[in-house]
Amino acid sequence: MSWLDPSYSLQKPSRGLIRTSQFMIDNWAAAPVNGTVSNLLSVEDDFDLIRLVFGNDTAAVSVVNNVILAPTANPNDGVNPLNGSGAAVAWTQVTFNANGADVLPSATPAGGTVSLTIPAATNANSPVRMFSDWMRVSSLPRSDGGALRLLMVRQFTAVSGTSRMPFAQSVLQPWLIPAVNRGRVVQSYVQFNVDGVSTPANFNSAVPYWFVAPLAVQYYSRTRGATLSVFGDSITAGARSLADRSGWPFLAATSLSSPAHPVQLFNQGWTGQTGANIYANAVATVALSKPDVACFATWTPNDQPATQATADLSWSRAVELAEMARVAGAVPILITPIPYIGLTAAQEAFRLSVVNRALSTAASGSMLVADMNSALTNGAFPARILPQFDSGDGTHPNDAGYAAMAAVVTPVIRQALAL
């Protein structure tokens, strides 16, 4: 059966209810020692089971000390959860009885373990990811007119421990603008020298921050939706777009998501990722992210100099990852490489060879392909990004360029999901 067969996506084994969302992309730092970080986050659908994903990108162990979570019916002050009547919602203690393992709720051991030690990573570009236990917590209907469901997560890092957190200092402020975030709220607050987890009321003089405690969340959705997982470099991340996050994956996912069919985005595009980094990270996280559709970059400008060997390797890795996604129950989509500045004529030929392989594969009916090259190229040789789509560095698109890329990939994702 071809991936182009519309019935394929309806028969995929993964069409279950687990969704995965990642909130920050790219950067990591040490959590504030003896401090509490609290986050207000949104997900696409109602949930009744939820767990947190934590990561470690360093050569030393990382310790998650103590975490609580709670649903909230509205943003309130960003740190104190409320129900629809305006009354306080009790926090739930997050446990790690399964020692970070990826297990179903029924296989989770009983107990009261509230900390997790994450082993050292062998490669900073492929962090170790581990899970909290599944927590039986139900989302709340919004009381403020919002459509998405809101979650608050709070983590305390003790003096004796170390913990790694994703962060984005330049992102969170513009991400507060509704026109930018499209309702996908990410807010962060910190209070130093206080444990606001063991005693939540102690978290009473917080200030805005830029760290997000969990790397990602997974939840059992109530609606037959989808997780869109994407893998690539800074172009996949959306670098040089609004808030550096409004790239084609975000635009595509949010345009396709609806209450009847929520689409949750898991973006693994990172700045500076080489082909080897993209490959290693995808190998580690394709199955973990529980995808329904998985998009893979087939080339990156970070592999320098471009050669026939790098072109062949990039392509072979992409098709291997596509098959890995298929085995995991997802429909794979390959992304053709866009033009960028600095390539010689010979190097441009290598890039175009990957474009042509992807188009040939799509024409044969064996693979879905989103041809981003055709949307952004000026048609020259060597090609460049069309001026109206160039952010100014000759490599990354601007917002109009990312919108053009989203216009290409969105119908392909729609086809994969049979929407």
Give residue spans per PLM region:
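Structural recognition of the beta-strand scaffold that forms the well-ordered cores
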Residues: T227-A237, V263-G269, D292-T298, A325, ...
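Oxyanion-hole/transition-state-stabilizing segment in secreted/luminal serine hydrolases
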Residues: A237-R240, W248, G275-S316, P337-Y340
